[in-house]
């Protein structure tokens, strides 16, 4: 089976971008709650 590099990159970005966005929001919320 041939690996589609562009497909892997697109999938990785599709997963990582929303995940990192949620992590940033979570960290900001935690920081505000600690104040």
Curated annotation (Swiss-Prot):
Belongs to the PsbM family. GO terms for cellular component: chloroplast thylakoid membrane; photosystem II. One of the components of the core complex of photosystem II (PSII). PSII is a light-driven water:plastoquinone oxidoreductase that uses light energy to abstract electrons from H(2)O, generating O(2) and a proton gradient subsequently used for ATP formation. It consists of a core antenna complex that captures photons, and an electron transfer chain that converts photonic excitation into a charge separation. This subunit is found at the monomer-monomer interface. Its main location: plastid. It is a single-pass membrane protein. InterPro entries: PSII_PsbM, PSII_PsbM_sf. PSII is composed of 1 copy each of membrane proteins PsbA, PsbB, PsbC, PsbD, PsbE, PsbF, PsbH, PsbI, PsbJ, PsbK, PsbL, PsbM, PsbT, PsbX, PsbY, PsbZ, Psb30/Ycf12, at least 3 peripheral proteins of the oxygen-evolving complex and a large number of cofactors. It forms dimeric complexes. Keywords: Chloroplast, Membrane, Photosynthesis, Photosystem II, Plastid, Reaction center, Thylakoid, Transmembrane, Transmembrane helix. This is Photosystem II reaction center protein M. It is found in: Plastid, Chloroplast thylakoid membrane. The chain crosses the membrane at residues 5-25.
